[in-house]
């Protein structure tokens, strides 16, 4: 197993649209700027709008009726409140216990 005689850092050229090769990975220089067309001058846009209004066909417009507008001020509902905890013990309540009748023992039989 030997090392190759070629250096892996070959091709480190200037970044003027040229390609860099570092450690076997190619890295391209920065991207070129994208050129786009300019918008039409305002004079042309107004002519198109005038043609739209002059024709018999209606152009699409944004609805301006009161029903379609978003209300300016919406009232939020109040924040939810915690429920009161159920009372576990009532000290004022008088408890009435069952008082057995005096002849209850006659119901049960004694076994010998």
Curated annotation (Swiss-Prot):
Signal peptide: none annotated. GO terms for biological process: regulation of DNA endoreduplication. InterPro entries: SMR. It comes from the Eukaryota. GO terms for molecular function: protein kinase inhibitor activity. Keywords: Cell cycle, Protein kinase inhibitor. Probable cyclin-dependent protein kinase (CDK) inhibitor that functions as a repressor of mitosis in the endoreduplication cell cycle. May inhibit CDKA-1/CYCD complexes during S-phase, preventing the re-initiation of DNA replication. Interacts with CDKA-1 and D-type cyclins. PANTHER family: CYCLIN-DEPENDENT PROTEIN KINASE INHIBITOR SMR13, CYCLIN-DEPENDENT PROTEIN KINASE INHIBITOR SMR6. This is Cyclin-dependent protein kinase inhibitor SMR6. It comes from Arabidopsis thaliana. The gene is SMR6.
């Amino acid at each position: 197993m030997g090392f190759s005689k070629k250096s892996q850092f070959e091709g480190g050229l200037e970044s003027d649209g040229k390609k860099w090769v570092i450690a076997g990975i190619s890295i391209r220089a920065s991207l070129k700027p994208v050129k786009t067309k300019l918008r039409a001058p305002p004079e042309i846009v107004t002519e198109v709008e005038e043609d739209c209004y002059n024709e018999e066909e209606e152009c699409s417009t944004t609805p301006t009726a009161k029903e379609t507008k978003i209300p300016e001020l919406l009232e939020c509902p109040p924040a939810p409140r915690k429920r009161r905890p159920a009372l576990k013990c009532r000290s004022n309540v008088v408890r009435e216990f069952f008082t057995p009748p005096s002849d209850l023992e006659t119901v049960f039989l004694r076994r010998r």
